[in-house]
Amino acid sequence: MNKKGFLDSSSTKILQDLAVAPIDLTAPGVISKERIERFSLSVEGFTLSYATERVDEGILSALEDLASERGLIESMQAMQNGEVVNYIENFPSESRPALHTATRAWVKESPLQGNAEDISLRSKIEAQRLKDFLNRYRDVFTTIVQIGIGGSELGPKALHWALKGCCPSDKKVYFVSNVDPDNAAEVLQEIDCAKTLVVTVSKSGTTLETAVNEELLADHFLKQGLHFQDHFIAVTCEGSPMDDTSKYLEVFHIWDSIGGRYSSTSMVGGVVLGFAYGFDVFLQLLEGAASMDLAALEPRMSENLPLLSAMLGIWNRNFLRYPTSAVVPYATGLEYFPAHLQQCGMESNGKSVAQTGEVIGFATSPILWGEVGTNSQHSFFQCLHQGSDIVPIEFIGFQENQRGKDIVIAGSSSSQKLFANMVAQSIALAKGRENTNPNKNFRGNRPSSLLVSERLTPYTMGALLAFYEHKIVFQGFCWGINSFDQEGVTLGKDLANQVLQVMQGQEKEGALLEAEALLRLFNNIKK
């Protein structure tokens, strides 16, 4: 498809005009029963209410036209089919597919082709190997430690935290990610090494932080008289330095076409979640994600949950020009989910070069951040209600808690109080509250949406994970950027190695000599 650029699309120009005077949420009668019913969508057990977004039918129609002009559904279909979407034209780039959806497509037996079919079949084989491994070793160990950084930690950790409230387990789970040795030392203080399985996750098999932490843990195990091969397994790409069954108890595979931040439904998340909660729980997670993958192919924006949410985000970012966006889950189980979304969104779409290789002249990823409610109401919500910047908020909530333990006080349960707080915040941000005292005046017109499901389960967590993955990817397609590389991460690794050369007194070509003065300054700090 020969698509116009984002700024050249006719719908973009229409939306720019509409953004001059968008709907006023504070006007009497705007947040009506009819609007709430009309501006909602239910898909795969989730209901999205966007009545408190600054949109009307005209804006929604123009957003749908923009999605069509930019070929978003065609691009999503191409990605799921295994076409090359990770590329920059006319410049060296990774030039490969993005096949995270194939890691779970096999559970639905979805018809695939080419690269997607290959990765789906391989993922099914790896899942069966994991099931066999768990049958042999899950009862041998009481604890698992996952070593990995970025997508090898943030996604699996968020999923583990989400499942622990609904899936009984007698296993202990820890993550070591930071190269700061205190991270590993803290975990080592907590575990019985003789009963611990360690899974090292690195696609390349050479990730600096991961290699250092593996060596640190291996040394500790050795000093306790334990053999590396009896306790350490690996998740890595075929042919990497870690792909060595003579060294590890077992090696599970992932592939270059699956980006770290999108890898939680591969063995990157499968091993630790399968060990903690059992293979069937991991399978339920995959089923939820695979269902949302199919839902993301619905051609109508009004019926496509991730596409609708993506375009609402485009409206807020590019036309209302809000620079940040908050995700606030009203569920303790999603405590680490905003951190995962922060990486997934900002590493994917924090770009200023189009796939054509041209520098772009419009905003891309907002700054993503968040925290669970109601805790967040007592930390940063003051700024959201009365601060000088408007921050769109995505609320996530559930009608039931996970653990089933609750109490009724003053006529309502704790779960009801939690849900009431979430709904109240959305309405308060939209409508505001007038007061003659300017310090108590709330101007309102602060947009938000609510995404609600019945209960946080493995299935709904899988669907929620995939929902946000697709939302982020849809936005990248709309902007015409590459959502699947991360050159900024690569730069940081390269420069750190150059600084280390200076610290070690190595005058090699490429050493970052500019760091010498800084290092000298800090070395003079008195102890």
Swiss-Prot record:
Q: What Gene Ontology cellular component terms go with this record?
A: cytosol
Using the UniProt record, name the top-level EC class of this enzyme in a single word: isomerase
- Identify the metabolic or biological route this protein is part of: Carbohydrate biosynthesis; gluconeogenesis; Carbohydrate degradation; glycolysis; D-glyceraldehyde 3-phosphate and glycerone phosphate from D-glucose: step 2/4
UniProt xrefs under CDD domains: SIS_PGI_1, SIS_PGI_2
Record keywords, A-Z: Cytoplasm, Gluconeogenesis, Glycolysis, Isomerase
Q: Where in the cell is it found?
A: Cytoplasm
* Residues forming the catalytic site: E347, H378, K493
What's the EC number here?
5.3.1.9
Q: GO molecular function of the protein, one example?
A: glucose-6-phosphate isomerase activity
Biological process terms in GO annotation: gluconeogenesis; glucose 6-phosphate metabolic process; glycolytic process
Catalysed reaction equations from the record: alpha-D-glucose 6-phosphate = beta-D-fructose 6-phosphate
Q: NCBIfam families under this entry?
A: PRK14095.1
Q: Which family does it belong to?
A: Belongs to the GPI family.
Function (record text):
Catalyzes the reversible isomerization of glucose-6-phosphate to fructose-6-phosphate.
The protein's name:
Glucose-6-phosphate isomerase
Phylogenetic lineage: Bacteria, Pseudomonadati, Chlamydiota, Chlamydiia, Chlamydiales
